[in-house]
A protein has these predicted regions:
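Surface-exposed patches in mature extracellular/periplasmic domains of secreted proteins
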Residues: 79-88, 149-154, 179-180
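Active-site neighborhood of HAD-like aspartate-dependent phosphohydrolases
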Residues: 81-88, 97-129, 144
Length: 265
């Protein structure tokens, strides 16, 4: 997850996210949000459909479980085929391995724009994220297969101990200060550091820049072109999780049918 930009969600955006989802997440501080006296009328309610789908829909649960099941099958195959013993998996955390939608829902209900990310520090310290369905089991399997696991996230380094504690509470393996790599160097540089010591056989994320620095700051048209170029990776050594709650696609113009609206009488 990447830290940047404001957020807009629409029902059409949610539908488009069912197969491939990207997201961006900005810098987070720890200030307290002020509640609106009339939250039902505030602009951030436009986030509601995407957030409701991510947190409450059985379809989201199915996609998450499906992704981790297939990733687990591919992981076993890759371990059997690998000649190197220094194998590694790299994963993002937020909305990839752990679910933080309770924070987003709290902010939205208080009419606070969660795209500002100024409430995230409090969540890192005191919040109770849940595991994405299938995630803990997948990483436990990787651990049993002797694969090193690196958690790369743009959570704040100052809250590293709290993030480690949250991951341990959710039964994620190989959680240490060496293997939980938080905000500092760009994600691409953190991945490169791991690649110098291991053969990375799989990556997981909820945004395209979780896989390659080529996607960082790329416009949507460029992202789609890169997805075509990288198609062989998806479902093989790259696995992307759905996240329609925020993303670099938020302000994209929608293509619409130009026929005159007619309703049946």
């Amino acid at each position: 997850m990447k830290r940047s930009t404001s957020i807009a969600c629409t029902s059409i955006a949610v539908v488009s996210m069912l197969s491939v989802a990207g997201c961006a997440a900005p810098d987070r501080a720890g200030t307290r949000a002020e509640e609106s006296p009339n939250p039902e009328n505030c602009a951030v309610q436009e986030h509601a459909m995407g957030l409701r789908w991510q947190q409450q829909s059985a379809e989201a649960q199915a996609l998450q479980s499906q992704t981790y099941r297939i990733a687990g099958e591919r992981l076993e195959e890759k371990v059997k085929q690998a000649k190197s013993k220094d194998l590694a998996v790299i994963t993002d955390l937020d909305e990839t391995a752990i679910d933080n939608t309770k924070l987003l829902a709290r902010d939205m209900t208080a009419c606070h724009d969660y795209s500002v990310w100024d409430t995230w520090g409090q969540w890192e310290l005191k919040g109770s994220p849940s595991a994405i369905p299938g995630a803990a089991e997948f990483f436990q399997k990787a651990d049993e297969l002797g694969v090193s696991i690196y958690y790369i996230s743009d959570r704040t380094e100052e809250n590293l101990d709290a993030t480690i504690a949250s991951l341990k509470d959710l039964d994620f393996p190989q959680v240490s200060k060496d293997q939980v790599m938080l905000l500092g160097l760009p994600k691409e540089e953190r991945r490169t550091k791991i690649q110098k010591e291991h053969k990375v056989i799989m990556q997981l994320g909820d945004t395209l820049h979780d896989f390659s620095g080529d996607y960082a700051n790329a416009h949507l048209d460029q992202q789609r072109q890169l997805v075509e170029k990288d198609a062989k990776h998806f479902g093989d050594d790259w696995f992307i999780l759905p996240n329609p709650t925020y993303g670099s696609w938020e302000d994209a113009e929608l293509d619409k049918w130009d026929a005159k609206l007619e309703t049946k009488k």
